[in-house]
Amino acid sequence: MAKGKDVRVKVILECTGCVRKSVNKGSRGVSRYITQKNRHNTPSRLELRKFCPYCYKHTIHGEIKK
């Protein structure tokens, strides 16, 4: 049986707070996490609350394109 595209794909989550601050040069860097998601169960963009070491708090990390 032929396998199609993989169901589980790696996604990169980026801090939305740091992205806004980096435009104004108020941040030292951008926090990124690498995780996996199941495309069949979660077809939309993934957003999780993760700890950002640059903001020093839990912020929303959104999925970005590779």
Swiss-Prot record:
GO cellular component annotations of the record: chloroplast; ribonucleoprotein complex; ribosome
Entries under InterPro entries matching the protein: Ribosomal_bL33 (IPR001705), Ribosomal_bL33_CS (IPR018264), Ribosomal_bL33_sf (IPR038584), Ribosomal_zn-bd (IPR011332)
Similarity comment: Belongs to the bacterial ribosomal protein bL33 family.
Protein location: Plastid, Chloroplast
Native species: Spinacia oleracea (Spinach)
Family annotation (NCBIfam families): PRK00504.1, PRK00595.1, rpmG_bact
Record lineage: Eukaryota, Viridiplantae, Streptophyta, Embryophyta, Tracheophyta
Subunit-structure text: Component of the chloroplast large ribosomal subunit (LSU). Mature 70S chloroplast ribosomes of higher plants consist of a small (30S) and a large (50S) subunit. The 30S small subunit contains 1 molecule of ribosomal RNA (16S rRNA) and 24 different proteins. The 50S large subunit contains 3 rRNA molecules (23S, 5S and 4.5S rRNA) and 33 different proteins.
Pfam families: Ribosomal_L33
GO molecular function terms listed in the Swiss-Prot or TrEMBL record: structural constituent of ribosome
Protein name as annotated: Large ribosomal subunit protein bL33c
GO BP of this protein: translation
Role description: Component of the chloroplast ribosome (chloro-ribosome), a dedicated translation machinery responsible for the synthesis of chloroplast genome-encoded proteins, including proteins of the transcription and translation machinery and components of the photosynthetic apparatus.
Gene symbol of the encoding locus: rpl33
Domain of life according to the entry: Eukaryota
Transport as UniProt keyword: no
